[in-house]
Regions:
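Conserved pre-motif I regulatory segment
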Residues: 2-40
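C-terminal accessory regions
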Residues: 349, 364, 369-499
């Protein structure tokens, strides 16, 4: 009986009549939540325009009405912000929820898996297609994010997890599919799997050229029939258009005041192309000649681990995780939601420059003192040192050789300290060795854009031929198309790819 009541509660929280797929998903969700086996997981897969966001919002509102505990998570700060806006409740990044920093033992920061002290709680993870199964980051826990997430959630206290995502998007780097959206992968953890797919495009989405073309591209993925580059339909749609290269500056200059710089993004295929666009936008659209100035948008390109200023800062209570339904003072982790203090600034986080001062050259590199605000974390402001060399390089961040050079030069300053542990402690606190590595954030690659959405997206695919067509390109194109919420501009789109 309660299973049916829960299903109807979810359906009641829709703002419009749900589709058959959404009704089926609500039924699956109610069965998942009422299963007496607490080691169960639900996978909700849905393509763009099928109402994943609406369903997730209805589930959150239902849980709130029933006074049930729920935590909203996403892989990146931007994705967490979008999830929060769409659901009306706070959301946090997966890393800030499940990891805590251990005592310093070496050169780099190391984060251990946190202990989940919650009970009777649903963890909803959006953009789960980005969660990796590969062991490629030993800084965090086991190095495998999906392993750690499962271990964290399932704590024998009746916690369970709902994974939400789109399997047509780019999978994690180095993987062919998104493991967190695969039932066989989740069963391998000893979990009972509930799963459903949303495929029916909402009626209000059918007038969208963005979603129409994204659906066509997605079908190429589903049927594995990509033998030539997809042709895009523009006729009859007001939300998708071609922008010739000689009109790009004027178009961007219109988008910035219309929807805001924070809601405008150029997406391209390489760091080299992103650098070209970033310099062009700063010089020709924004009229900025300084190397770095107030108002510049930046993207962090390497994790920065912050040494806490006092012991209590290390264990700040995570407000986004538990505070929807009351604080749990025993649950301590990296940082409080809405603040960066005591934790880390993640690769991919966005920042806006508030002040720049004291530019200088040391150790063969150039640095500046800056005040940054972080729009995905309630515009929290932080004073820190940034390294200017990464702004224009084609490499994703400082190269291994550059990092080694900086390490050796900084360590010379601490050569008079006899104990290695004490030297390493000084290095860990050194502003220059730990300077934030950033690039300009007006144009980014699609992997950096994943999980985010912007009102106006300018898409540059660069030179492509049928011979260059790969499954990865189709996933890339689908992911890029679905980053736009209001208008998608295709930059220098070839006539051969117009329907």
């Amino acid at each position: 009986m309660f299973t049916e009541e829960l299903m109807y509660d979810v359906l009641r929280h829709f703002a419009f009549n749900p589709t058959d797929d959404q009704m089926f998903a609500a039924d699956i969700f109610s069965r998942f939540m009422t299963d007496r086996d607490e080691r169960c997981v639900m996978i909700l897969r849905g393509i763009a325009g099928t109402g994943k966001t609406s369903l997730a919002g209805a589930i959150v509102r239902t849980m709130m009405d029933l006074k049930q505990k729920v935590t909203l998570l996403a892989p990146t700060g931007r994705a967490a912000k979008v999830f929060s806006q769409n659901s009306g409740q706070p959301a946090a990044t997966v890393h800030r929820c499940i990891y805590r920093e251990k005592a310093f033992t070496g050169l780099d920061g190391k984060f251990n898996l946190n202990v989940n002290l919650f009970r009777d709680r649903l963890f909803m993870v959006d953009e789960a297609s980005m969660i990796s199964l590969s062991s490629n980051n030993s800084t965090f826990g086991s190095g495998c994010l999906l392993d750690d997430l499962v271990q964290y959630v399932y704590n024998d206290r009746n916690c369970r997890m709902l994974l939400i995502g789109d399997k047509a998007q780019l999978p994690p780097v180095g993987e062919e599919e998104s493991p967190a959206l695969r039932a066989d992968v989740m069963r391998a953890y000893g979990l009972t799997v509930y799963e459903c797919d949303l495929n029916e495009v909402l009626r209000q989405s059918q007038d969208s050229g963005i979603l129409y073309n994204a659906t066509v591209i997605r079908q190429m993925i589903t049927h594995n029939e990509a033998t030539q580059l997809p042709k895009i339909r523009f006729n009859g749609f007001a939300d998708i258009s071609v922008v010739p290269g000689d009109e790009l500056i004027e178009s961007l200059a219109s988008s910035y005041p219309e929807v805001g710089m924070d809601e405008t993004m150029v997406i391209t295929r390489s760091n080299k192309r992103a650098n070209i666009f970033n310099q062009g936008i700063r010089n020709m659209v924004l009229g900025r000649e300084e190397e770095l100035t107030t108002g510049d948008m930046l993207m962090v390109v390497k994790n920065k681990y912050k040494a806490p200023h006092n012991p209590s800062e290390q264990g700040e209570v995570q407000t986004a995780v538990g505070e929807m339904t009351g604080k749990d003072p025993s649950h301590r982790n990296i940082s409080s939601f809405g603040g960066i203090a005591g934790g880390f600034i993640a690769n991919g986080d966005r920042a806006t420059v508030r002040r720049v001062r004291n530019v200088r050259e040391l150790y063969g590199f150039r640095f500046a003192d800056v005040t940054l605000s972080f729009p995905d974390y309630d515009n929290t402001e932080e004073d820190m040192v940034v390294i200017l060399d990464t702004l224009k390089t084609e490499a994703p961040a400082l190269t291994h050789e550059q990092n080694e050079q900086l390490f050796q030069r900084v360590m010379e300053d601490y050569a008079d300290i006899p104990l290695k542990a004490d030297r390493m402690k000084k290095l860990r606190e050194d502003d220059y060795y730990n300077a934030l590595q950033v690039k300009f954030g007006y144009a980014i690659t699609c992997h950096k854009a994943q999980g985010g959405q912007w009102a106006h997206v300018y898409l540059d695919q660069g030179y492509m031929t049928d011979e260059m067509l790969t499954p990865d390109y189709i996933h890339w194109l689908y992911t890029a198309f679905t980053r736009a919420t209001e208008h998608l501009y295709l930059v220098n789109w070839p006539k051969t790819q117009i329907e």
